[in-house]
Amino acid sequence: MNYKDQYKSKIQENLKNVTKELETRNMQLKISNWANKFGYSFGQIKEKIINDEIFRCVFAKDPAKQNLYQNLAAQYISSLDIVENFKVLPSGGKNAIYLTNGKILQGHLLKNQSKDIKSIDFVWTCNNLTFYASHKYTEVSGGAQDNQYKDIQDFLHHSRDCNEKNTIFLAICDGDYYLQKDSQTGDETKIKRLQRLTDNKTSFVLNIDSLSSFLQNITN
């Protein structure tokens, strides 16, 4: 899957939507706040948006903040013939699903658990197996990106102690970040470092392009 091309396509769509949304309350509030912040009138900014495509980019929504990468992954996984009962899980709340110390828990059961636990993104079934997946698309290095890397390591750590039968945990890691060397451990790539943390029996690390063949192999 080419996430970068999908991002470019979506951001062009969002750019076109700026002028379509000029009369909406949210856009007018955004323009008003921007105008007040920099000392311009509402009318000046609105006219500039209409006539200047480059300036219009300031007000276009960032696809990355619209769950683009998770949505693309969800569309792809759910389209696979072998996948059944696919669900995108809530990121929080009582119906979210968490993995902690080998236990799969819904949000309403987390009262006495650590608040740092990240929810699982997707769940589906194949044949008699249930798959729980954490998905990350991480492009460049940085503090926030390193936190995502740590989230995956924590997910794999918590999966080790799970004794649920016919249950598989997947860390789906996409983006150039995972192809970079891990300077702390010396691993050739970060994804190889993550793969060393799995037992390759009930937990696995892979990218989305290898998911289809992986599911075919593990369910045969």
Describe each model-derived feature in a short phrase.
Residues N101, K115-D116, G143, Y178:
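Glycine- and small hydrophobic-enriched segments that form the cores of compact globular domains
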Residues D52-R56, N127-K136:
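Glycine-rich, often proline-containing surface loops adjacent to acidic residues and nearby aromatics
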Residues P63, S79-S114:
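A short acidic/basic microdomain associated with nuclease active sites
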Residues K115-Y132:
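Active-site beta-strand-loop-beta-strand hairpin of nuclease catalytic cores
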Residues Y137-Q184:
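Catalytic cores of nucleic-acid endonucleases
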Residues I168-N220:
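Domain-level recognition of nuclease-like catalytic cores that cleave nucleotide substrates
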Residues L72-E84, F155-N163, I218:
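Hydrophobic, Leu/Ile/Phe/Ala-enriched alpha-helical segments that form helix-helix packing faces
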Residues M1-N71:
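Nuclease-adjacent, charged terminal/linker segments that flank catalytic cores
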